[in-house]
Amino acid sequence: MPKTTMPDRFWTKVDTSGECWIWLAHIDAQGYGRFGQEYAHRFSYELHRGMRPIPTGHQIDHICHNRACVNPKHLRAVTNKQNGENRKGPNRNSTSGVRGVTWNKRHQKWCAKFRHNGAYIYVGMFDSLNEAEKRVIARRNQVFTCNTKDRRKRKV
């Protein structure tokens, strides 16, 4: 009886019916699929590139923000900084619900700023949350290279 290959075993654990290819086997506490001792998305990335290893100093970014997705079209090798640029949204403790926008009590305005290379980039103070959001997104798009979420058309 022929031995089952790693790719054959991998494909029995993937649902390819949607845009995101969902890992059906073990999912860890952080939401990532596990394939033996390896992350499923990392195995998928390497498998679809002829088993070439992920470049040194890089990690795999889920462009779709779905940690269980193993679709190679949704995966890219990026640096830690680039992966941080493509964050899904605001911090858990955000009071505005908008990434990079906070309420300034002293000035009674929305303050838009974000971090880049260890320093804050100040965008401005705004009367409306909507205007602050538009301006911080526009400025991040000028500075960041891997923030696909900001570059998608916003639904109004």
Give the ranges of each region predicted by the language model:
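J-domain helical core
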Residues: 129-140
